[in-house]
Amino acid sequence: MTQEQATRYPLVLVPGLLGFVRLVIYPYWFGIVKALRRGGATVIPVMVSAVNSSEVRGEQLIDRIREILRDTGAEKVNLIGHSQGALTIRYVAAKHPEMVASVTSVAGPNHGSELADFLEKNFPMHTLRGMLLNGLIRLLASIMAVLDTGYRGTRLPTDVDASHHSLTTAGVELFNSQYPQGLPKTWGGQGEELVNGVRYYSWSGTLQPGLSDKGRNRIDGTNVTCRIFARTFTKERGQCDGMVGRFSSHLGTVIGDNYPLDHFDIVNQSLGLVGKGVDPVKLFVEHAARLKAAGL
């Protein structure tokens, strides 16, 4: 074991919508946790409500961080959030900056998701289509909760409406008005890296024909799903990962926003079946070294 990724503070990994720690033997952060631990990092994947508002998830995460600080003796944590997990960790850092050394958004909808806007418009919650979609998401969340062998805490609440609104452009705009730390002042720009003693970083990917749809993604159904979802985008058409737009993902120092990775690839899903051009696990390993070099 090397110490190249041995950060000063623990790395706490927070999943997105319908996230989990480990489904039976299948981890959300496929290959990522092992790679970071091989480099000497203390890595703790956590669970919050799979389907709920970013604020509710954030309050759950605050409680979990307090446990981690108590158990490890650390003064702070480095938070890394994928998708809605990015909004969740931003909430925590805004509320309790004294507990957080850094916030890293990985494909986070920091200005909302055009996919969520499309679903809100075409599947209103009080229509039959909306209720069917709501029921399907509830069912998936329930099944995944039963199968998640990586979490053994109390049953976490589910609120599909709150979760959906938290991901729309309007919902995130309201969120950003309350928790603006690290946001760019101009569309497509970079935000301040250091706010209230917390360092902010982000990276994301885009669908790139000839790269993101090649390699092992040719047998990964999630890539097809992302390509279908990408058709719902207008403002960032051709500049998204299927669920989150390139510029919408920006937060703090933007490490990269155009990796040839779809929304699942960026956390090495599914089963490490990703396209050509970049190794998503390497991005996490390099970032841990970056945090270590910054004294975090």
Predicted feature locations:
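A conserved mid-domain beta-alpha-beta active-site/ligand-binding segment of alpha/beta enzyme cores
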Residues: 151-207, 216
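C-terminal catalytic-base region of ester-bond hydrolases, centering on the histidine
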Residues: 187-296
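Active-site catalytic motif of lipid deacylating hydrolases and related acyltransferases
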Residues: 3-77, 125, 131-133
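Short, solvent-exposed loop/turn segments at secondary-structure junctions
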Residues: 17-19, 50-51, 109-111, 205-210, ...
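Glycine-rich, phosphate-binding/catalytic loops in enzymes
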Residues: 28-31, 96-98, 119-123, 219, ...
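Short aromatic-enriched loop/helix-cap "lid" or pocket-rim segments at secondary-structure transitions
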Residues: 24-26, 114-119, 211-216
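Serine-dependent carboxylesterase/thioesterase catalytic core
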Residues: 15, 43, 59-173
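Short boundary motifs at domain starts and secondary-structure transition points
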Residues: 1-5, 191-192
